Amino acid sequence: MSSNLLPTLNSGGKVKDGSTKEDRPYKIFFRDLFLVKENEMAAKETEKFMNRNMKVYQKTTFSSRMKSHSYLSQLAFYPKRSGRSFEKFGPGPAPIPRLIEGSDTKRTVHEFINDQRDRFLLEYALSTKRNTIKKFEKDIAMRERQLKKAEKKLQDDALAFEEFLRENDQRSVDALKMAAQETINKLQMTAELKKASMEVQAVKSEIAKTEFLLREYMKYGFFLLQMSPKHWQIQQALKRAQASKSKANIILPKILAKLSLHSSNKEGILEESGRTAVLSEDASQGRDSQGKPSRSLTRTPEKKKSNLAESFGSEDSLEFLLDDEMDVDLEPALYFKEPEELLQVLRELEEQNLTLFQYSQDVDENLEEVNKREKVIQDKTNSNIEFLLEQEKMLKANCVREEEKAAELQLKSKLFSFGEFNSDAQEILIDSLSKKITQVYKVCIGDAEDDGLNPIQKLVKVESRLVELCDLIESIPKENVEAIERMKQKEWRQKFRDEKMKEKQRHQQERLKAALEKAVAQPKKKLGRRLVFHSKPPSGNKQQLPLVNETKTKSQEEEYFFT
């Protein structure tokens, strides 16, 4: 079956003997697989090219060309006339004489010529079919020979491939055996490693547990050592120093130095406690003077000193003994023989802690009171600074006004010197000037020192007061002055914004009022005929409506001058 099917599938292909290589035994390449298709495409292209150069009347349709080239179109004509088909007849020249059957006995020359043409076409078609059949038979024989050669070659290749597969299977079996042996060895090694690692982990866990217990016991031992009296601790330290003679020259100086440091620290803390007690007494006295209820302290400074001295003796006992250079391998010694002794020491320490807590609370309360007083003083100073700045601005404005008045007076004096001097007017001006000077003096200094001073002396005092205020302003920190200026600017901007909003609201109310009046007013009825524009007489009196800006300026001037 394969030998019969392959020629039909690979028709038109030619295979050369020995063209395939030995490394590709399963591939057969056909050279002329698409040769018929390529020839048809080339024929179509040439036919298109020829049709482009032909005239219109020279061109033919596809159906006409097929009729002229095919004899089947001629065969389809006769069954329609006679009602018969050529399928009844077998292959060969038998259908040719039967074409005449069913035709009329009387025929024209044209019909005879057509019949002869049809006969010729049928004979030609039969001959071409015979030739093509012979050609196909030759091709089939050649392809069968080629297929036999290919089958033989395939058998040889299959034998070689089977040999290769057998060798490959043998090698894979050997490799699998080696891999299995390696995996077994690896599993044994991993099992041994796991066992060793588990043993190591167990040892490490035991070491960690023992280290934890050792730390806990050392902590408890150091705690008991800390709770023991100081003289006993010094004795134990001396014993350890004597036991380790190599380290005696290093440990004893350190112990003495630490003891001296602890004593100095105790004295400093006692001094600080005395100072804080004095501060608390001052604060309580100050509160009593201000009218607030005074608070009595629970303990005197002497009691605090004694309690602090007792507490420091037990707190500092471990620091000079917990040195890195001390030996821990010595046999431990305990001062406490019974648990009740340790509990008694702990109770005493608890009482000392309570006293210290109460003392710290007292100190915190005193600090809060001091902070409150400081805040009150700061507020007072800030208010004084603001007041002084306002006074300075007022005095500067008064000085500017007085300078302007002095310039006016100087001009008037020059006019008086040219012969226009009037003693009455001069006296009136001097009286008004003295009144203004007294007003400025009262504003700047007050009414207390107004007795028996002439205007010049008052001006001198005002000037000295201004100098003092300028010095005070310079002594004030720049940050405070800038903060006050910012506050004043903020107040001025807020005031300006409020005035602007009030003006806007008033203007809106005026507009609403005008709109309401316009809505409520009765409409004007036009009487008579309306005049034309060019015949309207000019009005004699022109009414000018006040603008909004003018009303605003007038209202601002009225507020400035009359409020």
UniProtKB/Swiss-Prot annotation:
Bias kind Basic residues: ranges: 523-533
Region of interest called Disordered, as start-end residue ranges on this chain: 1-21, 272-311, 522-563
Keyword Coiled coil in record: yes
Pfam (any one): DUF4200
GO cellular component: centrosome; manchette; perinuclear region of cytoplasm; sperm flagellum; sperm head
Annotated Polar residues bias: 1-11, 282-299
GO terms classed as biological process: acrosome assembly; intraciliary anterograde transport; sperm flagellum assembly
Listed GO MF terms: ubiquitin-modified histone reader activity
Keyword NAD: no
Coiled coil: 129-212, 384-415, 497-522
Keywords: Cell projection, Cilium, Coiled coil, Cytoplasm, Cytoskeleton, Differentiation, Flagellum, Spermatogenesis
Protein location: Cytoplasm, Cytoskeleton, Microtubule organizing center, Centrosome; Cytoplasm, Perinuclear region; Cell projection, Cilium, Flagellum; Cytoplasm, Cytoskeleton
Subunit record text: Interacts with CCDC42, CFAP53, IFT88 and ODF2. Interacts with CCDC146. Interacts with TEKT3. Interacts with ubiquitinated histone H2A.
Function: Essential for male fertility. Required for sperm flagellum biogenesis. Also required for acrosome biogenesis. Required for the attachment of developing acrosomes to the nucleus during spermiogenesis and may be involved in the transport of fibrous sheath components.
Name the UniProt record assigns to this protein: Coiled-coil domain-containing protein 38
Biological source species: Homo sapiens
